[in-house]
């Protein structure tokens, strides 16, 4: 890997044994190296990358670690909303994919993508989507974004054919866009835990 994967990226490993520190027994039965794991937030004194494994059931989620040199492929949330990929998906008729296609019609000033079950389905073509699936959206925001533009995003999201939630990723963590615009502050999820802040683009002193 030429760059370090970021939270929400999907990564593939070179071997099943590359997945470290997994305690849940179902992982050995359901996961194989042909399936991706998702990068999560955590810190490690061995410089490993924190990942999560998705099981067949909604409640089946397991946390583990991987060494960067064992990652052979990385798909970012932004890659999953390329129009050609969305239109060519076997799930193109599902509401979350239709919603993502609708969002691509507007020239947003930021990079964005999809995560969660929709992202997993688009990346793997595994049928984990259904008619009632939500759409999890991610906006990359290395710098503060214009509030009015973000309100326009939320207005368009509210018109989508499925329920959708937006997380905004800053250099210091991620927060729920709706919460921040409504309350003026939000819970910022960082690698060291969550903290309530009105300034998610500033490092905590």
UniProtKB/Swiss-Prot annotation:
Catalytic activity: apo-[malonate decarboxylase ACP] + 2'-(5''-triphospho-alpha-D-ribosyl)-3'-dephospho-CoA = holo-[malonate decarboxylase ACP] + diphosphate
Keyword Nucleotidyltransferase: yes
Signal sequence residues: none
Active site residues of this protein: 134, 136
Claim: Nucleotidyltransferase is one of the keywords in the record: yes
Enzyme Commission number(s) from the entry: 2.7.7.66
Family under the similarity heading: Belongs to the MdcG family.
Protein name: Phosphoribosyl-dephospho-CoA transferase
Organism: Klebsiella pneumoniae (strain 342)
Gene: mdcG
